[in-house]
Regions:
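GST-like domain detector, emphasizing the conserved glutathione-binding G-site
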Residues: 1-121
Length: 121
């Protein structure tokens, strides 16, 4: 049975976009929500009350177990994709794919405003 997945983030692309795209590509069902929808309170309240591991988003709830850090989330959701060769079996090719992922993460630091667009302009 597939786990119940809740991806918790703000309504922007940024750090949750890779997980969203991977889940969509894999045809994996999940619920996208914000802190209000998942915890019943706004981000700052969730943060100050200790509901957020490391005090930040995104989070992925897997059957209620919270996973933090976008890289960890991305690698977990990639492991759920059943399409052939999505994660290379060759260790060098897998490392190259992971390096590409890390490079994409670096881009968020140098062009943050691009990651706020959520629709075609």
């Amino acid at each position: 049975m597939s786990p119940k997945l809740d991806l918790i983030y703000f309504d922007v692309r940024a750090r949750a976009e890779c997980a969203r795209m991977t889940l969509a590509y894999g045809g994996i069902q999940y619920n996208f929500t914000d802190t209000q929808g998942y915890f019943g309170c706004d981000f700052m309240t969730a943060k100050t009350s200790g509901k957020l591991p490391w005090g930040q988003l995104p989070l992925l709830a897997v059957d209620g177990q919270l996973i933090s850090q976008s890289g960890s989330i991305n690698r977990y959701v990639a492991s759920l994709v059943t399409k052939p060769d999505f994660i290379p079996k060759n260790p060098v090719k897998a490392a190259l794919a992971d390096a590409l992922h890390e490079t994409a993460q670096d881009l968020f630091r140098i062009m943050p405003i691009v990651n706020l667009w959520t629709e075609e302009k």
